[in-house]
From Swiss-Prot:
Keywords, ordered alphabetically: Amidation, Antimicrobial, Secreted
Protein family: Belongs to the frog skin active peptide (FSAP) family. Brevinin subfamily.
Tissues expressing the protein: Expressed by the skin glands.
Organism of origin: Nidirana okinavana (Kampira Falls frog)
Protein name per its UniProtKB record: Brevinin-1OKb
Amino acid sequence: FFPFVINELAKLPSLISLLKK
């Protein structure tokens, strides 16, 4: 469970920076 959550949280900043571009 935790590895999956951490993986999803790690993806969020890159998705947000892509949207901000």
